[in-house]
């Protein structure tokens, strides 16, 4: 092989190696920042189409309705623990150590982002509450299906205080 061909071959091999290195670093960075959405049922039983369950320590987002009567607040700190359920009957306990959104309440649709712990709880770093009675994150709406019912108000409630 003459020297000119050797140079071209080395250049092509170097370019391919560089592209492979950049692609692998990019995939690694995306993998560490990727948050997959799960419903409480999918955490327990795996995704319906693949059966894949989230791993302990994996960053995930969980969406569903806050179970009425499940909220436990620590009186000495901001720590709060509550259950989130979905239409499939699944339930996951969420722990959170910060201020909850103003719109947060039991029976409310929420999305919590955090890390799955060994005991099956979600240690949330962020909790998002829906904006009004008409809004629901698309993932939660799909997961909840037809079981999400709009609140019904009486005529007295609709009129407000006069």
From Swiss-Prot:
Q: Which regions of this chain are Periplasmic-facing, per the record's topological domains?
A: 30-162
Q: Which GO terms describe its biological process?
A: cytochrome complex assembly
Any idea which UniProt keywords this protein has?
Answer: Cell inner membrane, Cell membrane, Cytochrome c-type biogenesis, Heme, Iron, Membrane, Metal-binding, Signal-anchor, Transmembrane, Transmembrane helix
Q: Where in the cell is it found?
A: Cell inner membrane
| Coiled coil regions, renumbered to chain | none
Q: Which Gene3D superfamilies does this UniProt record tie to the protein?
A: Nucleic acid-binding proteins
Q: How does it sit in the membrane?
A: Single-pass type II membrane protein
Give the residue spans that cross the bilayer: 9-29
Q: Which GO terms describe its molecular function?
A: heme binding; metal ion binding
A single GO cellular-component term on record: plasma membrane
Pfam families xref list: CcmE
Cytoplasmic topological segments: 1-8
Q: Which residues bind heme?
A: 131, 135
Top-rank taxon, per record: Bacteria
Tell me yes or no: is Iron among this UniProt entry's keywords: yes
The record ties this protein, via HAMAP family, to: CcmE (MF_01959)
Q: What job does this protein perform?
A: Heme chaperone required for the biogenesis of c-type cytochromes. Transiently binds heme delivered by CcmC and transfers the heme to apo-cytochromes in a process facilitated by CcmF and CcmH.
**Which family does this protein fall into?**
Belongs to the CcmE/CycJ family.
What is the name attached to this protein's record?
Cytochrome c-type biogenesis protein CcmE
Gene name tied to this protein: ccmE
């Amino acid at each position: 092989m003459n020297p000119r061909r050797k140079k071209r071959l080395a250049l092509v091999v170097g370019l391919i190696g560089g592209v492979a290195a950049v692609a692998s670093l990019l995939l690694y960075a995306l993998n560490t920042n990727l948050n997959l959405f799960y419903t409480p049922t999918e955490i327990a039983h795996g995704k319906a189409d693949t059966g894949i369950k989230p791993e302990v320590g994996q960053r995930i987002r969980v969406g569903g309705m806050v179970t009425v009567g499940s909220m436990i607040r620590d009186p000495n700190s901001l720590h709060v623990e509550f259950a989130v359920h979905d239409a499939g009957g699944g339930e996951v306990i969420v722990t959170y150590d910060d201020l909850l959104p103003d719109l947060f309440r039991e029976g409310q649709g929420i999305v919590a982002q955090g890390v799955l712990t060994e005991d099956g709880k979600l240690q949330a770093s962020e909790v998002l509450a829906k904006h009004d009675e008409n809004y629901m994150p698309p993932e939660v709406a799909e997961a909840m299906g037809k079981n999400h019912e709009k609140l019904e108000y009486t005529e007295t409630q609709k009129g407000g205080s006069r």
